[in-house]
Amino acid sequence: MKFTLSWLKQFLETSASVTEIAEALTAIGLEVEEVIDKAAELQKFEVAYITNIKPHPSADKLKLCDVETKSGMLQIVCGARNARAGIKVVLANIGIEIPNGKFKIKESVIRGEKSCGMLCSEEELLLASESEGIIELSEDAVVGENFTKYYGLDDPIFVINVTPNRGDALGVYGIARDLAAKGIGILKELEISVIKSTFISKMKLNVQDKEACPLFTFREIRNLKNKPSPDWLRKLLKNVGVKTISSLVDVTNYISYSFGQPMHAYDADRIKGGITVARHCEKHSDEAISGQQNEIATAALQPRNDVAKCHALNGKEYLLTENDLVIKDESGIQGLAGVIGEADSSCTDSTTNIILEAACFNAKMVAASGRRFQIDTDARYRNERNIDRNFTEKALDIATNLILSICGNGEVSEVVKVGEKESQKKPLDFSACYLEKITGIKLNIKAIEAILNKLGFITDVKGEIIKVIAPSWRHDITILEDIAEEIARIYGYDKIESIKLPELDQDNNKLREHKRISSFKRILASKGYDEVVTNSFMSSEDAKLFAELKEELFLLNPISIGDNYMRPTILPNLLSIVSKNLARSIKDMAFFEVGPSFIDLNTEATYLTAIISGSYNNKNPHSFGRGYDVFDLKGDLELVADYAGLSIDKCIATNGTALPQYYHPTRAVNIGLGKNLLGHFGQIHPKILKYYDINQEIFAFELNITNLPLIKAKFGKRDEFAVSDFQANFRDYAFIVGQDHRVGEIISYINNFNKKLIKSVILFDIYSGDKLPEGKKSIAVKIELQADDRTLSDTDLNSFSKDLVAAISQKFQGTLRE
């Protein structure tokens, strides 16, 4: 949002300096990004006067100008078409640097003629993106003085960042109201002259969708002269970057910037019949799409036959769908409501009769249409942040008065209106105790009431309670915390006393969870993984490859068509990154992300998802090199699981839970703890890779951190690490068991069979085939045996083998393979 100091002073009586105003704006939440002072930047450029002009003897397109300056007469070579005798211009003397191009003016000879300066255009001074000639100043400009005050540039420009909830601050009047509440000045009372209508408009108004357009007003004005706007208006608009077109259009822009109420002026002679506000091409009930979410999710993706064209003011043509709110007459579309007008009914220099519109439209519909067509206009920007419906008719009156004062006293109709003002909001019970509780600010009820009244709130004190009604322009005030924030920002955040924060409970579950996630990240980073952060939304087309789509997970108001669904897993986002990297010939990569995945509307889980692909090490004189495989991934997952106090081998789940369809059916597994599914790891299915245009193997793991047991931190002395001095023995066993038995469960059982002797159990083979009975598999393990107090004898080893075989037989109905 841009505005100038003089514009602010139209509504605020203040003697505060630019610096004081800027500091106050930032303090009340209207962050000042920049203060532009063109007068300071262009102070060396002065007013000059062209006394005589003649053609250049050696160049048809150049002219020799005799220029009067404060230091005397100069000859300047100029090629501008509008250069002529008798006009005041902007002079850059020798030694001055031109902003556009950053070059210094030197005395030069151009095609044999001396030139002692430069006559400047708006483009050269960075006052416009393009210009057709040199700047022409008003006749009252004094030769030798700085030109900025004659060109309206001696007016500092404030550039503020307005948050989406503060639609009321998109008008200079709203900003002035906040500054007055802060004590920077006194808010001027708006003086709106009563308009005497001279006729009743025959133009009928039909609003078919009151929810989409809660208020639409217009006034017909006849016999106007659409002449150029006065200097004060043109300067204001030019300083904030708005192109001046004609007085009729300039007034609507002025009202939009002054009060945050978008307006539009139609050429009344081009409007046929009445005005209708409706959703374009409403579908019949037998064709209606079932479910609002389904409509939102699919409307933008599917081609439609019932489309019409809007030839917009920006010169572009748009195809409309039934989701677009339009303004139309008998001849067709006359505008995309709240976004942009139609070129065919726009005002021109010859326009004498207008229809002046001031309306309020559904913010979500305006945002959706603007986003779908990628149209960014001041009207859209304000409409999608909600308009003060109770000020709309006042804005229409102010605009009407201004047009009549500039364009002549034309004939004015009565206001044509459909819709009503917004009803008063429900009061909220606020108190000084509540304010102190959540902000630490100690104020009495009278001080609280004074601040709120300055901001336009309606208050009623009942003892210790103050009933507060938010003003119509503050759509964001809905709860007590909002009121507390309003008081705090006007009172001053810098005045809130600082207090010492309470000591953190080191055994707090949230703190331990945060530390654990941080450790997971460090572990993977140490293994060469790069952390990424991706959007929690994704395309429903991608999502259906990874999970069954659920209606409640579609976004009603997506940021873009490609982000219309809440992600069921992080994996698609990582695969998209892999695909983009491969397109740039980057083949070796390892990524991870910690973030939410959404199962349904009530179930959200935090996942650690990692992905590797490419070469583990490259070919070199000492090695042929090899690519990543699933065991590399498993090793990295084991490090993470070990920190969480788990063993991956013990957590491999084969209890009948189906593997997600996006994993390779025989090269991936589920991991779990009891009946609790913790995630999956393995190779990604080739069909998924083909969809993402990935031509190399991808390995990934997903770990549900939410379901991971949070092991309480152990404090105290660790057990002493002891190494046996006696010889270790190794024995290989191959057991035949049923296919339904989990390998991890068998390994875990063997590990715990005799903890005094067993030091390690390593799985080295799994076999199933013709040499085994149907429904059976062979599991081969290497067991390291070692006692702490003696060397194991053959008797000890044979006894161990006998007991182990018997235990496997009893527990898993397994037999020793011959």
UniProtKB/Swiss-Prot annotation:
Q: Which cofactor does it need?
A: Mg(2+)
Q: Which UniProt keywords apply?
A: Aminoacyl-tRNA synthetase, ATP-binding, Cytoplasm, Ligase, Magnesium, Metal-binding, Nucleotide-binding, Protein biosynthesis, RNA-binding, tRNA-binding
Localization of this protein: Cytoplasm
Q: Which reaction does it catalyse?
A: tRNA(Phe) + L-phenylalanine + ATP = L-phenylalanyl-tRNA(Phe) + AMP + diphosphate + H(+)
UniProt source species: Rickettsia conorii (strain ATCC VR-613 / Malish 7)
In the record, the note on similarity to other proteins reads: Belongs to the phenylalanyl-tRNA synthetase beta subunit family. Type 1 subfamily.
Q: Report the residue ranges that make up the B5 domain in this protein.
A: 423-498
Keyword tRNA-binding assigned? yes
| UniProt-recorded name of the protein | Phenylalanine--tRNA ligase beta subunit
Q: Which residues bind Mg(2+)?
A: D476, D482, E485, E486
